[in-house]
Amino acid sequence: YMSAVYAGYGGKVPRLSKDNPDRDFGDTNIHVKGNVDIDAIGSGLQVNQRGHILVDGGGKIITHPVETSDTYSVVAEEGDVYVNAGADGKHPGTHDLVAVGNVGLINKDYGRDPNHNVEPTNIALAFTTPNSSLTGAVLNEYAESNKNPHNSGADIYLQNGATWNNEWIGMERPTPKKERPSGDNEAYLYKGSK
């Protein structure tokens, strides 16, 4: 299990610089000036801690489900990923985009290397052609936990005959400890698109 494309560990990471815990590693940026063609066991595109991935085109992001961990075509933890959606995630492009795997906005305020919670987490994916499709669910831990100080979120553009098969892929997620705002504790399926 691994990430096909990963950008992260920016900012201050004391574990990585014990001699200088105040060292700032800056941002990690990946800019793909065309389409992607990813086939991965694990995550397709992943960012954390001031990581940024921008894909000008579309392409394919195919992940294969595993039963021991979550399976994401795109996942972000205090960083941003924009595919076929412009440099700011607000301008959907015209490229074919096929993604198989969940989309995750992870509020990692736990475990080893928790995020600093000083930057937003944003994902924008533009499925704007009849040949474009998303198979997977959208998990937004910021919305689920009711902790979203930086207005983190996902913009899923679904236009011009593109399709979305909204189902969870891979390992089942446990029922949340807190009631979800919608009262739907069976499964979290993102219901909004543009």
Where would I find each of the regions flagged by the language model?
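Long, low-complexity, polar and repeat-rich extracellular regions
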Residues: 1-194
